[in-house]
Amino acid sequence: MSQPISPGLIRSTLRQFLDSEASGGLVLMAVALAAIVTANSPLAEGYFHALHIYLGPLSLLHWINDALMALFFLLVGLEIKREMLDGQLSSWSRRILPGAAALGGMLFPALFYILFNRENPAALRGWAIPTATDIAFALGVISLFGPRVPASLKIFLAALAIIDDLGAVVIIALFYTSDLNLLALAAAAAVLAALYGMNRARILKLWPYLLLGAVLWVLVFASGIHATLAGVLLALTIPLKATPGTREASHEQSPLHHLEHILQKPVAFIVVPIFGFANAGVSFSGVSAATLTEPLTLGVAAGLLLGKLVGVLSTVFLLVKIGLADLPAKASWGQMTGVAALCGIGFTMSLFIGLLAFNDPDVQDHVKMGILLGSLLSGLVGAAMLATFNRRS
């Protein structure tokens, strides 16, 4: 007769899962699949209706993408700052690599898209759609491999995706925003200056930063710029080290480490899964073979799958070979190729730009299919390459 499973064993197993590096990626993949199934089931109408219910000034979907995801960007920003000051990005040769790779990873996808749509001037308005990398999904996939992927590569991907998102924000502001609120933008700059001043004054309490951070989010949102940028900007002002000689002076007890520790589990198991479920639900109704072979669909898919891979990898190869940058520590070229492919997971920001670029629902369907196809293939290719070269190394 089999023995009953003890509650202690269940708690221990659950704790091991939550503490494993791959767990966040597994949860994200599961909820993304659940969203796709839901969006193509009898529950689809309720799913899409719920996302567009207005709660105050914003729909539920916008609260998730603009407010909740600011916490994700805050956490990623904290990690980037820590690595830049005291980690894998602490030298200029390592900082320049993700920056240049992000630029290459935006230029080549745009060129691929233009190549497919050069005969249709109206479609060229969507040139920026495949330039974006979805940082949450890309990091979710790479986290599936846990410690088998060097930490330096994960930091490289996070830094590249952050710069990529900042580039997407600039593109939206310059090419897809007609009513930028300069007054709100100026006020946001003033709040950011105050946060920087607090850092320079060595104010170590977290609550003043978080309070002004909330104000910064409101002002960035009001300016017309994607509000998640506020999370990154706030992170850059959080102190990494305490005042020398104080009890809090160790790295582990610095404000940045403390906030990073607070955010890690909620972001991995609440924020990102909610984001994934809200954004991954793409309906296949009305999709035909003709939809998949339209130049617009193919341009978006090729831009994400091929443009990102070629743009990121060729830029990294060039910089390393001419001696301007170093390959991330303990990483192989095979692993770098896999990470370059993961950069083609576009999803949220690509969808956002696509909806801004085109108002026609039929055209939007083509855009969504291109994003889904390109992102899915990029994720599969990147994961396959990482799995292959992780075994070899």
UniProtKB/Swiss-Prot annotation:
Pfam families: Na_H_antiport_1 (PF06965). It is a multi-pass membrane protein. Coiled coil: none annotated. The keyword Isomerase does not apply. It catalyses: Na(+)(in) + 2 H(+)(out) = Na(+)(out) + 2 H(+)(in). The chain crosses the membrane at residues 24-44, 58-78, 96-116, 126-146, 155-175, 178-198, 214-234, 267-287, 300-320, 338-358, 369-389. Na(+)/H(+) antiporter that extrudes sodium in exchange for external protons. Belongs to the NhaA Na(+)/H(+) (TC 2.A.33) antiporter family. This is Na(+)/H(+) antiporter NhaA. It comes from Rhizobium etli (strain ATCC 51251 / DSM 11541 / JCM 21823 / NBRC 15573 / CFN 42).
